[in-house]
């Protein structure tokens, strides 16, 4: 049985064969927990293995494990978080009133049935975390939706560690969203349609004809889907995945959701209002593990460096997320490029088809081709290539991601 059931990924296929299937599931889960702890206890910590565990089916399994692994994925010292002093910043912060309004509207982000007093206390902590990070990093600008990311970390790791983790995240993965303008955010959204075009040109052309644009995916991207998913288990599963990957992985996941809903989109009236309304409502019963696997495959087959020219709408002076990610990876333990893994992925294609299938754009459905290639079966070479790819492609990112 797949590990996904522990993450609320929906019922698995087939029926229980006595206790055999349950025993198999428990054995896989126990094995994965042991592998995670082995990586944590290695000297130095085997961060590459932790990234693979975070990406692979089931993710990091429990919040207890996340409290240990998330700091490693972000290269944060969990034993020395910064002091909390956000309460002293409320009167002087220009963002306080907006943060307060957003936090007050965040009731549904807290577990149902949580005592009101406890929830109100957490909301106060949420405000303090945000204001402290903004005070310590004046180059960062608050945006509506930022609190949706912060509250996820708060609920999993607590106030003190959440401050350290979100601060690191804000200066790396989220950096483009925290510019004074939305130019870089819009540029990242511009990757969505080229990804869809590579996989399903028919769907791409339909959406272009409808002139739906990409604004429907804005809240997905800037909140890491925290604002639009009602089941907290799905949210933290995606955070496992995104924390282990390149900063642009959320836009690949957004593309995979659209591709998964292909028939619904094509059955819509071909107009902006109809398609936007459909896509802005994310189904809550998505096959998350399958979509995570496919997003990883697409990142490997169509890396950002190959899509940058299409995605670029105008010359970008800032290349913050891509350039800082290289420095971030260099600072993380056990992060080395692995050409063998990339070659293993390319070995899945016949030599005469490599250039034709990866770099050209035949008007066929590549989503089906990915499944046929078998890349999503166990996330093996593709997952490894995803976690190792950032350094290998870093020079291209710096030159081409924001051309």
UniProtKB/Swiss-Prot annotation:
UniProt topology in membrane: Multi-pass membrane protein
Protein origin, superkingdom: Eukaryota
One function term, GO molecular function aspect: GTPase activator activity
SUPFAM superfamilies: Ypt/Rab-GAP domain of gyp1p
Compartments (UniProt record): Membrane
Regions crossing the membrane: 238-258, 367-387
Ranges where the Rab-GAP TBC domain occurs: 60-246
Residues annotated as site: Arginine finger: 105
Spans annotated as Disordered: 1-25
Keywords: GTPase activation, Host-virus interaction, Membrane, Transmembrane, Transmembrane helix
Result of altering residue 144 to L: 1000-fold decrease in GAP activity
GO annotation, biological process: acrosome assembly; COPII-coated vesicle cargo loading; endoplasmic reticulum to Golgi vesicle-mediated transport; Golgi organization; lens fiber cell morphogenesis; lipid droplet organization; positive regulation by host of viral genome replication; positive regulation by virus of viral protein levels in host cell
Residues marked Glutamine finger (site): 144
GO cellular component: endoplasmic reticulum; endoplasmic reticulum membrane; endoplasmic reticulum-Golgi intermediate compartment membrane; Golgi membrane; nuclear membrane
Matching PANTHER family: TBC1 DOMAIN FAMILY MEMBER 20, TBC1 DOMAIN FAMILY MEMBER 20/GTPASE
Assembly and interaction partners: (Microbial infection) Directly interacts with the N-terminal amphipathic helix of hepatitis C virus (HCV) NS5A.
Role according to the record: GTPase-activating protein (GAP) specific for Rab1 and Rab2 small GTPase families for which it can accelerate the intrinsic GTP hydrolysis rate by more than five orders of magnitude. Also shows GAP activity for RAB18 GTPase. Promotes RAB18 dissociation from the endoplasmic reticulum (ER) membrane into the cytosol, probably through stimulating RAB18 GTP-hydrolysis. Involved in maintaining endoplasmic reticulum structure.
Disorder cited: Warburg micro syndrome 4: A form of Warburg micro syndrome, a rare syndrome characterized by microcephaly, microphthalmia, microcornia, congenital cataracts, optic atrophy, cortical dysplasia, in particular corpus callosum hypoplasia, severe intellectual disability, spastic diplegia, and hypogonadism.
Description of its domains: The arginine and glutamine fingers are critical for the GTPase-activating mechanism, they pull out Rab's 'switch 2' glutamine and insert in Rab's active site.
Protein name per its UniProtKB record: TBC1 domain family member 20
Organism: Homo sapiens (Human)
């Amino acid at each position: 049985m797949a590990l996904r059931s522990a993450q609320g990924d929906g019922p698995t296929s087939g029926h229980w064969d006595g206790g055999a299937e349950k025993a198999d599931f428990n054995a896989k889960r126990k094995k994965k927990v042991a592998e995670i702890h082995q990586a944590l206890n290695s000297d130095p910590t085997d961060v590459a293995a932790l990234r693979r565990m975070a990406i692979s089916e089931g993710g990091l399994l429990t919040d207890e494990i996340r409290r240990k692994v998330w700091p490693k994925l972000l290269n944060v010292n969990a034993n020395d978080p910064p002091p909390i002093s956000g309460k002293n910043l409320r009167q002087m912060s220009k963002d306080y009133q907006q943060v307060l309004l957003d936090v007050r509207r965040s009731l549904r982000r807290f577990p149902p049935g949580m005592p009101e007093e406890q929830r109100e206390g957490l909301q106060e902590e949420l405000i303090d975390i945000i204001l402290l990070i903004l005070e310590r990093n004046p180059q960062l600008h608050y945006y509506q939706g930022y609190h949706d990311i912060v509250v996820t970390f708060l609920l999993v790791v607590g106030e003190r560690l959440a401050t350290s983790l979100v601060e690191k995240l804000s200066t790396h993965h989220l950096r483009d969203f925290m510019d004074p303008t939305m130019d870089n955010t819009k540029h990242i959204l511009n990757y969505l349609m080229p990804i869809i075009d590579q996989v399903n040109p028919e769907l791409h052309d339909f959406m272009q004809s409808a002139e739906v644009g990409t604004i429907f995916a804005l809240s997905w991207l800037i909140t890491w889907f925290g604002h639009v998913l009602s089941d907290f288990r799905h949210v933290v599963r995606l955070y496992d995945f995104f924390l282990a990957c390149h900063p642009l992985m959320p836009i690949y996941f957004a593309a995979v959701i659209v591709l998964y809903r292909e028939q619904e989109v094509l059955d819509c009236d071909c107009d902006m209002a109809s398609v936007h309304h459909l896509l802005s409502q994310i189904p809550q019963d998505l096959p998350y593990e399958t979509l995570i696997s496919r997003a990883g495959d697409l990142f490997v087959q169509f890396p950002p460096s190959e899509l940058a020219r299409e995605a670029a709408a105008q010359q970008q002076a800032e290349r913050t997320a891509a350039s800082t990610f290289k420095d971030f990876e260099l600072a993380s333990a056990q992060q080395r490029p692995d050409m063998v893994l990339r070659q293993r992925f390319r070995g899945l294609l016949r030599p005469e088809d490599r250039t034709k299938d990866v770099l050209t754009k035949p008007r066929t459905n590549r989503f089906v081709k990915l499944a046929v290639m078998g890349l999503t079966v166990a996330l093996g070479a593709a997952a490894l290539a995803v976690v190792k790819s950032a350094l290998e492609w870093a020079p291209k990112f710096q030159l081409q991601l924001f051309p």
